[in-house]
């Protein structure tokens, strides 16, 4: 009997321990934070690089006194033709930069590239800011200064000339570069807008090639054709001589 009682007690203790463990697991599951897989938009946004252009202190004057805050201007890009700019204000610098990055990722602009440079020359304007952008050869590098350099680098352009012709305000310069880069178009796009259809640039032969082909055809003409042309010229000259002699004889007879 004593052995049976001991077995019953041990089994009851085991059951109670199992119940306690199950309740603990349930409680921990309630407070566990669910981790969801990252969306594609977050994964794409992580590819962007950031550059802080300016950080300045701003003040707001009220009846109670002056309130100081920090304003940051940040440029974001993936170096593959996507660039964005954003501004942010906060009581501390890191918070202002975070706000600016968040706004820049919402205001992305696509830029048309031609290998490592831009397709053509363009003048971007915004307010009093003006910037001239020109294409350059491979190996030239980025010849630009100020806020425009950050925009050009993060856009993926590595060979370009840029010159500021207007205001030196950072925001105006950045917006002027955005206006200039976004207005650029490739040759195919211009042809589509003008004629409503695309052309294969490979099929269109340059003028020099056409001239060379024409010269080659002239050289390859057979000798018989040249002889026929010479005979026709001689016959025409004889006919002219006969007409002239007939006219002279008629005038003498009169």
UniProtKB/Swiss-Prot annotation:
Function: With S4 and S12 plays an important role in translational accuracy. Located at the back of the 30S subunit body where it stabilizes the conformation of the head with respect to the body.
HAMAP family reported for this sequence: Ribosomal_uS5_B
Region (Disordered): 1-45
Record's subunit section: Part of the 30S ribosomal subunit. Contacts proteins S4 and S8.
Domain remarks: The N-terminal domain interacts with the head of the 30S subunit; the C-terminal domain interacts with the body and contacts protein S4. The interaction surface between S4 and S5 is involved in control of translational fidelity.
Organism: Mycoplasma mycoides subsp. mycoides SC (strain CCUG 32753 / NCTC 10114 / PG1)
Residue intervals of the S5 DRBM domain: 48-111
Keyword Metal-binding: no
One GO MF term attached to the UniProt entry: rRNA binding
Superkingdom field: Bacteria
One GO term (biological process): translation
Family in the record: Belongs to the universal ribosomal protein uS5 family.
Record-linked PANTHER family: MITOCHONDRIAL RIBOSOMAL PROTEIN S5
CC annotations in GO: small ribosomal subunit
InterPro entries associated with the record: Ribosomal_Su5_D2-typ_SF (IPR020568), Ribosomal_uS5 (IPR000851), Ribosomal_uS5_bac-type (IPR005712), Ribosomal_uS5_C (IPR005324), Ribosomal_uS5_N (IPR013810), Ribosomal_uS5_N_CS (IPR018192), Ribsml_uS5_D2-typ_fold_subgr (IPR014721)
Disulfide bonds, paired cysteine numbers: none
Keyword entries, A-Z: Ribonucleoprotein, Ribosomal protein, RNA-binding, rRNA-binding
UniProt xrefs under Pfam families: Ribosomal_S5 (PF00333), Ribosomal_S5_C (PF03719)
UniProt feature, compositional bias: Polar residues: 8-25
Protein name: Small ribosomal subunit protein uS5
């Amino acid at each position: 009997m004593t052995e049976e009682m001991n077995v019953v007690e041990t089994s009851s203790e085991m059951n109670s321990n199992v119940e306690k463990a199950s309740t603990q697991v349930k409680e921990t599951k309630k407070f566990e934070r669910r981790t969801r897989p990252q969306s594609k938009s977050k994964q794409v946004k992580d590819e962007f690089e950031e550059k802080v252009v300016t950080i300045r202190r701003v003040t707001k004057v009220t009846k109670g006194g002056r309130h100081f805050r920090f304003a940051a201007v940040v440029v974001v890009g993936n170096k593959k033709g996507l660039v964005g700019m954003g501004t942010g204000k906060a009581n501390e610098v890191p918070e202002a930069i975070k706000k600016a990055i968040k706004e820049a990722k919402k205001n992305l602009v696509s830029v048309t590239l031609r290998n490592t440079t831009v397709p053509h020359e363009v003048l971007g304007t915004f307010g009093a800011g003006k910037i001239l952008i020109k294409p350059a050869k491979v190996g030239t590098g980025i010849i630009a200064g100020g806020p425009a350099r950050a925009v050009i680098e993060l856009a993926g352009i590595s060979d370009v000339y840029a010159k500021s012709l207007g205001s030196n305000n950072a925001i105006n310069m950045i917006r002027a570069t955005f206006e200039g880069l976004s207005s650029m178009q490739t040759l195919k796009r211009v042809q589509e807008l003008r004629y409503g259809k695309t052309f294969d640039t490979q099929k269109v032969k340059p003028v020099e090639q056409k001239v060379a082909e024409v010269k080659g055809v002239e050289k390859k003409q057979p000798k018989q054709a040249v002889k026929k042309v010479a005979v026709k010229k001689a016959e025409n000259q004889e006919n002219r001589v006969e007409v002239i002699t007939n006219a002279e004889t008629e005038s003498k007879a009169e």
